[in-house]
Regions:
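Bacterial N-terminal signal peptides
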Residues: 9-20
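Catalytic zinc-binding patch centered on the HExxH motif and its immediate surroundings
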Residues: 313-315, 348-372
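C-terminal, non-catalytic "cap/extension" segments appended to globular domains
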Residues: 38, 139-147, 259, 295, ...
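Short pre-active-site segment immediately N-terminal to the catalytic Zn-binding motif
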Residues: 312-316, 370, 374-390
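Post-HExxH zinc-binding segment in Zn-dependent metallohydrolases
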Residues: 414-444, 452-458, 532
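Sec/Tat signal peptide C-region and signal peptidase I cleavage site
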Residues: 22-26
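Active-site recognition of the HExxH zinc-binding catalytic motif
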Residues: 246, 381-401, 424-425, 532
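A well-structured
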Residues: 27-310, 323, 496, 564, ...
């Protein structure tokens, strides 16, 4: 889950068009990747050699298990370096399929190396001391090797279901690419209400914002019927496959892979639902402020712009570096030093561009054992959400650096997605908070504080909506109560209302199911964001209560890799076993405190301060 889910996507067009207002344009950088490989030819030669080393290891006889495992571990470190390098090359030029094809090969190679290592662990004597640091990996390997009740059935189900699910995901993309989004011509500028959704949401012209909001939903609705067929068909196949393989429902299987179960998820969702009034209160506060600022009968599209007269600045890269570093001061000088080094333009560890060109619109860390961490951002607009994206990916990159410091096994660098993502979301929350704390103008403080609160809404409420909606769709298909686009609209409206939205006033929101990409591309993955967000907000809370102890716990877990069950690592982070409903209450308490601070800022702005 390295690619970050956000409320927004890159809003390059509008920011670059408005750059003179800010006085600074975003800067481009190319990362120096020679610390990974001198060039593509060197990478190819090293990859060929690694393939031969693995083949030799797999066929070698007379090697002690500990030595065989150590060799596989070293090979995995090399393989991760190839993966990082090729991921970067493929993203730099999305039109060149050669790096992407090589990346696919490397992913297969890394998987074979990992399987070889797990096989050694399974076969090692129970009392072998060298296996102690790999107890969690060994337990997974033993579980993985357990023969299913009907192995032939399992293989047959996978052989049929996997291609079908891939086809549904591709079909979703094809259908939405043909969606008919209204086009707008205004002041010599052409706007596409689909492509320019976020740019229109931030435009100072109220009529243009409204047209953009309504046009986006109109475009989604234009493909409502075929999208319903795709989603319902996908759910039917995925759920049937899970049940045939003895995993219960597809959502239950997803929860189990996270280290949770249906009852735990349901309890968490219910706890969030009990706070729906907090979300409604926040939304109403934004609407009241818009009304007091002179907007007649304000609507949702009137809450997405800064206060009149305030233009958020575009940060130069050194400013971004300093802000991100200041945001994480409580983690100590070592962490801050690594973060500054990563984000210092002079070190050429960031790969950023101001125009897309042939680049992928993606963002991810570039990290491998024995190599300096870097990061890639397809397009940096200089707008706030673009810089938050950099802070987020920097959190992922620093996680890789800390695992290297902690000598984490290359075989244990990847673990539970929701825990991995929580670390990066924590960095983005801190980045927003730092911008809020250092701002002086009340309008600037309100702008940055609202962005922090909106992020928390995303992590807590939107994630809950998505998890509940996906679970409910699977349940409805299983009991035959869902079968049409109208059914999906009605169900979506019910879920949104439960978590504080107003589909009665804004009926377009009932079409939200159409735009939930991960429901189609990675079924039952969205619930990971709920727990990532819950934990990230709690990390933000705890680092203020007891900074010294928190720093020790956090950096210890950050450096060890994924050598334990995720709930055990969360227990160490929090100082106690996670009680998810209680964490919901604690997170929402802080949310409401921050909302009160924003309310006070609104009062100052309405009195004319900061004008």
């Amino acid at each position: 889950m390295q690619a970050r889910r956000m409320r927004t996507t890159a809003v390059v067009a509008v920011i670059l068009a408005m750059a003179p207002l800010a006085g600074i344009r975003a800067e481009s950088l190319q990362a120096d990747d020679r610390a990974y490989f001198a060039d593509a030819a060197a990478e190819q030669r090293a990859r060929d050699a690694l393939e031969k080393q693995l083949e030799a290891l797999q066929h070698a006889a007379g090697i002690a298990p500990a030595q065989r495992f150590q060799q596989a571990e070293a090979m995995q470190a090399q393989c991760l370096r190839h993966h990082a390098y090729l991921h970067l090359q493929a993203a730099r030029n999305a039109r060149d399929h050669r790096p992407a094809q090589a990346l696919d090969q490397v992913m297969g190679l890394c998987s074979r190396i990992a399987r070889t290592a797990r096989a050694v662990l399974r076969e090692a004597p129970v009392d072998a001391e060298w296996t102690a640091p790999y107890a969690f990996l060994r337990a997974r390997a033993l579980k993985e090797a357990a023969v299913p009740a009907d192995a032939a059935l399992d293989e047959a189900v996978d052989a049929l279901a996997d291609p079908a699910l891939d086809s549904f995901a591709r079909l979703r993309g094809q259908i939405l690419r043909s969606a008919e989004y209204p086009q707008i011509e205004r002041d010599g500028r052409h706007w596409d209400t689909g492509h320019d959704k976020q740019a229109l949401a931030r435009h100072p012209d109220r009529a243009l914002r409204e047209a953009g909001w309504k046009g986006y939903w109109q475009g989604l609705q234009s493909r409502r019927e075929p999208m319903a067929s795709v989603l319902l068909g996908l759910v039917q196949v995925n759920d049937a496959a899970a049940r045939l393989q003895g995993d219960g429902s597809a959502p239950a299987r997803g929860y189990q892979r996270m280290g949770l179960d249906t009852s735990a998820v349901d309890a968490t969702l219910l706890a969030i639902e009990h706070h729906a009034g907090d979300r409604r209160g926040y939304q109403n506060m934004l609407l009241r402020h818009a009304a007091r600022s002179g907007i007649d009968a304000p609507q949702l599209w009137d809450t997405t712009v800064p206060d009149a007269g305030y233009t958020p600045p575009v940060l130069a890269l050194p400013q971004l570096r300093d802000t991100a570093a200041d945001a994480m001061q409580h983690l100590g000088p070592a962490y801050v030093g690594e973060l500054r080094a990563l984000l210092d333009p002079a070190n050429r560890r960031m790969d950023l561009a101001t125009e897309r060109g042939d680049r992928s619109l993606d963002a991810f860390p570039v990290s491998a054992p024995g190599a300096p961490a870097m990061l890639f951002v397809g397009v940096r607009s200089g707008e706030l959400e673009s810089d938050v994206e950099i802070a987020h990916e920097a959190g992922h990159a620093l996680h890789g650096e800390w695992m290297q410091r902690g000598h984490a096994s290359p075989l244990q660098r990847n673990g539970s997605p929701w825990l991995t993502e929580a670390f990066a979301i924590y960095n983005e929350l801190r980045f927003r908070d730092q911008l809020y704390q250092q701002a002086q103008d009340p309008r600037a403080k309100a702008y940055y504080l609202k962005s922090l609160l909106d992020d928390m809404v995303l992590q807590l409420f939107t994630s809950s909506e998505e998890a509940q909606l996906e679970q409910s769709i699977y349940r409805g298909v299983a009991d035959n109560t869902l079968g049409t686009a109208d059914d999906l609209d009605a169900l979506t409206g019910q879920v949104l209302a439960r978590f504080g939205q107003d589909p009665e006033h804004y009926p377009q929101l009932r079409n939200s199911w159409i735009g939930k990409r991960l429901m189609y591309d990675d079924p039952n993955y969205l619930v990971n964001y709920l727990y990532a967000g819950l934990l990230a907000v709690q990390l933000y809370v705890q680092d203020q209560r007891d900074p010294e102890r928190f720093r020790q716990r956090y950096l210890a877990v950050l450096g060890e890799g994924f050598d334990r069950a995720p709930n055990e690592q969360v227990a160490q982070l929090l100082g106690q076993a996670p009680d998810w409903p209680a964490l919901v209450d604690a997170d929402l308490q802080v949310f409401n405190q921050l909302a009160a601070q924003l309310r006070a800022l609104h009062a100052r702005i309405e009195q004319g301060q900061g004008a």
